[in-house]
Amino acid sequence: MMISVKSRLKIYKSGTFLVALILLAGCSKSNSSGGSGNVVVKKPDTTVTVVDTTILAPKAVTKTNTQKVYVHYLPWFETPATSGTGKWGQHWTMANEDPDVILPNGRREIASYFYPMIGPYASSDRDVIDYHLLLMKYSGIDGVVIDWYGVQNVDDYPLNKRNTDSIFSRVPATGLQFSICYEDATLAQDKAVANIDTITAAKSDFSYLQSAYFGSSSYVKINNQPLLLCFGPQGLKTPNDWQQAFSVLTTKPRLLTLDYADADAGSSASGEFVWVDSGNLNSLQSFYTNRTPGLNTWFAGAYPGFMDFYKPGGWGNTLFLIDYNNTGTLQSTLSLAKSSNAQYLQLITWNDYGEGTMIEPTLDYNFSFLQTIQTYTGVSYTITELQLIYKWYTLRKKYVGNTAVEKQLTQAYYYLVSLNVAKATAIISALN
């Protein structure tokens, strides 16, 4: 396990961890691979064609807030159906949790203090991806920034890459945008496990990004440059490292590093993005006031709170705690982002359950974080549309294999991406 040496603390998980199967009193075991005991997550199958239906082009939501709002997304979750090992992925288990254990409250035992409304899921599951992207769209979120580990066959990086590809394949249909946050700390693991030179590995990673993503019309561009965030630098440590790694690219990305770190990338960097740390609002305000005037491009940040599971999960010590204050912390960080006059905002995060920064619907906070974001972005939608999307997802899972119903739900999906809520509601209500 690698720990960031930068000013922002984040745990990097790699390798195989011994999982202690803890059976709590009153708990039971389940072999189901999704939800809280009653939802089966189907294994993704990209060879299955979408049933015949009327495909509708996506329409953009209307927002009163002109700020571009993106959300940091973790694509690292696996179920027994998708992990390749028949086991739950380590980001649901950490070192000692077992999602096959059903707790007295009906929840699966996962490595988090919080619980997804749809239960623990697979990041490559198309239904999950569509559910997430639809929620983002109706919350006024413009796009997703995916945490990406590169292309090397090391640890769980291939699964991360597969899942990212799966998400990217679903983005255009929604009309949202897509970008990458490169975890260059993984380059050290590439070297340690596969003996791949750091620069060579980075070149392979960037070549793939250029061929697979950068050219897409759905990929985020700033001044015609593809946006690339880096959670560091940590692997590429000098300006020369970055120049060498970028030498394989025909178009230089608009590279943003972590706050106060752009000098490590030299002229290859175009700015920075702020991240959550123990200083909370003081750290954000200091970045906006003292740092951003000298930056070409920068991202503000907003988050609901911070409560990591690392110590109880057996992955080291607790980092720090930021109280959620219901939705108070999210509202405060959004308010600072607005007053900073930032052109771009990154929501931290969609689904980092290990650190408790998730804004997606949970059994703990329901839709409240997304409702707060709806108010911030100035969309006309409310919890009603968010609940409708949740119902759509549950029906997708309920009627797996029922071709006639799947066709109706596919049509409802296209009504949703084209903002025809009334027609989507009619289909979903009839089935529900």
Predicted features along the sequence, with ranges:
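N-terminal secretory signal peptides that target proteins for export/translocation
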Residues: 1-11
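Sec-dependent signal peptide recognition
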Residues: 10-18
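C-terminal motif of bacterial Sec signal peptides marking the signal peptidase cleavage site
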Residues: 23-26
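Glycan-processing catalytic domains of CAZymes
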Residues: 41-432
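Bacterial lipoprotein signal-peptidase II cleavage site
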Residues: 28-36
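Short, intrinsically disordered low-complexity segments
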Residues: 7, 28, 41-42
